[in-house]
Amino acid sequence: MNIHEYQAKELCREFGINVSNGALALSADEAVEVAKKLGGNVWAVKAQIHAGGRGLGGGVKIAKNLDEVKKYANQILGMTLVTKQTGPKGKLVRKIYIEQGCNIKKEFYVSLTFNRAKEQIGLIASASGGMGIEEVDKNLIKTLNIDPQIGLKAFHAYEVGDFLGFDKDLNNKFYKFLNGLYKLYIATDANLVEINPMVLTAEDEFFALDAKMGFDDAALFRHENIAAMRDLDEEESSEVEAKQYGLSYVKLDGDIGCMVNGAGLAMGTMDTITYCGGKSANFLDVGGGASAETVAKAFEIILRDKNVKSIFVNIFGGIVRCDRIAKGILEATKLTKVEIPVVVRLDGTNAKEAIELLKEANIENIYSAHDLEEGAKLAVKLVNGEK
């Protein structure tokens, strides 16, 4: 789960991380009132969406008077903001964050995330802040792995601080800043805390000028305050609905719908589709306890995507029985008008019974495949009108 910048900064404050004063606004008039209350003579007007690159997309403006605050608020609210992270469709801006300006001497990048290969917490830092870390020369990036059994220590901060060119006094301040970030990361079960930029002010203090946070969904039951920050407007409606039925669904931009059991098999299926010249329209894992009803719901969700031209169902029956999947497919054809071709590959528990069920139904646009590659090739051919 991701949260907005203003929410991430609320959490930063709780852990003693310096952030500028700011508040949320839902209208241009409210933005002006917020700026008045904050005081000062420079304010940042920031679009609040779950994506980076807002500045380049026109979603962050610096206002030097209240008239400009109102003008920029009117420009940003209601706009569809397109960035590298939103995709071409962009995201609708429903709220903005008004923040006091600060005296910036230098910008940096710093983040904490989980290094799965090392099973440690990855600290990434760069003196090139304010831009996407993927665009920075690798020689300007410092990476460090922190053993969670040991935690962040002063020597970690000093090693990174030396790389960033800090003197002793700044290293001590950087350690305090970084220690707050680390405690925030651990305490909230975050999978990402990204400060871009972290700025050094004219007063030689470190501030989080922007903050991005993501969390492990499986740990949200331990954090009711964070779960309450979820903004469903920022999430794909089909993905939200799928979760309610125990389905793991992620919408993509291809034209071959996928329905698979197990995340590993799902990723392997998508790779095979790509290898065969196709492009997946989604990731969909029906899980191990799929019933005929959940399979029918999965079909309904896939078919809602008008880009989908064929569907590939790839099931290996272990816990989930293949005959349940077959019944779900047949149920889906009764409840929803399935006009596109459906390729079905079933193997494992009750696979023979399942295949017989589909044969007996004799539905014209359901095709059977014996293995993964055959199924993927057929799904790609059917998209192109071949058989």
Curated annotation (Swiss-Prot):
Coiled coil: none annotated. Its cofactor is Mg(2+). It catalyses: succinate + ATP + CoA = succinyl-CoA + ADP + phosphate; GTP + succinate + CoA = succinyl-CoA + GDP + phosphate. It comes from the Bacteria. Pfam families: ATP-grasp_2, Ligase_CoA. ATP binds at K46, G53, R54, G55, E99, C102, E107. Binds 1 Mg(2+) ion per subunit. Belongs to the succinate/malate CoA ligase beta subunit family. Succinyl-CoA synthetase functions in the citric acid cycle (TCA), coupling the hydrolysis of succinyl-CoA to the synthesis of either ATP or GTP and thus represents the only step of substrate-level phosphorylation in the TCA. The beta subunit provides nucleotide specificity of the enzyme and binds the substrate succinate, while the binding sites for coenzyme A and phosphate are found in the alpha subunit. This is Succinate--CoA ligase [ADP-forming] subunit beta. It comes from Campylobacter hominis (strain ATCC BAA-381 / DSM 21671 / CCUG 45161 / LMG 19568 / NCTC 13146 / CH001A). The lineage of its organism: Bacteria, Pseudomonadati, Campylobacterota, Epsilonproteobacteria, Campylobacterales.
